[in-house]
Amino acid sequence: MNWTELSIIINHEAVELATNILENHGSNGVVIEDSYDLINQPEDKYGEIYALKKEDYPDKGVRLKAYFNELTYDDKLRQRIKDELLNLDELDQHNVQFSEQIIAETDWENEWKNYFHPFRASKKFTIVPSWETYAKEADEELCIELDPGMAFGTGDHPTTSMCLKAIETYVLPQHSVIDVGTGSGILSIASYLIGVKRIKALDIDEMAVSVAKENFRRNHCETLIEAVPGNLLKDETEKFDIVIANILAHIIDEMIDDAYNTLNEGGYFITSGIIKEKYEGIQSHMERVGFKIISEQHDNGWVCLVGQKVSE
């Protein structure tokens, strides 16, 4: 199987909406190459730690690289994406450029590694690729060593970052945690680094479970995290203090009632993967079953909600 890399050079004002369009149409990740990064210090408040190469960036504007399965990326999808992008009010149509190339599966398996470097994902957590070395910058820094494989997120998506921030705030060592749709296992590992002793990681995809187990081994917690295939919380009988779910909004909506029933009194439901257009519906459903919304984060068109199970 091959992949189509759709490359688009656009103005800065259109980046957020264009990225959402690409992701909503099934892109398996979007790489953002911003010409401003060559001018400004490559360091944000969490500290990026890698050198930038001029040849990787456009002369002006922003290059977005989106990756689509060649079998599903046809003329209709190509035109639909182009039409939606060209209809954006924020887009400077005089300076937009489109190009495509085919990337072989063997190349794709390693191509994404060129864009994955150690980075601070939140106040405490730093994500470190398994093939790179990294020295902690502070004693309180918690490092997650990750080899997500090409099918799973690297931790730099806004939804993951927001979940990590919520874990920092609400998860305590004495809590028990269930991570639904664990993927690479990053949120389970974060809970372990906080000091949690009882963690269960579920994913309907057995490949995800395998990847997660390998990442648990890399972080020396494979014996402390139970990683198993599972269909959301439908068959879960054990109670937990924390339910974490960073998955798509329609799946979150399907599991809200089960999340409430799985939680101990006073427990927290940390959930993201919600686009801003759908978060009010998710929030209303959570409140309807008995959750009190105690935290709401927004980042680049995505939302993370934390609901607490409270007494009537």
From Swiss-Prot:
Binding site for S-adenosyl-L-methionine: 160, 181, 203, 246
One Pfam family here: PrmA
Localization annotation: Cytoplasm
Biological process terms in GO annotation: methylation
One example GO MF annotation: protein-lysine N-methyltransferase activity
Any one GO cellular component localisation term in the record: cytoplasm
Presence of keyword Transferase: yes
UniProt cross-references to CDD domains, sorted A to Z: AdoMet_MTases
InterPro entries on file: Ribosomal_L11_MeTrfase_PrmA (IPR050078), Ribosomal_PrmA_MeTrfase (IPR004498), SAM-dependent_MTases_sf (IPR029063)
Name listed for the protein in its UniProt record: Ribosomal protein L11 methyltransferase
Originating organism: Staphylococcus aureus (strain MRSA252)
Organism phylogeny: Bacteria, Bacillati, Bacillota, Bacilli, Bacillales
Gene symbol of the encoding locus: prmA
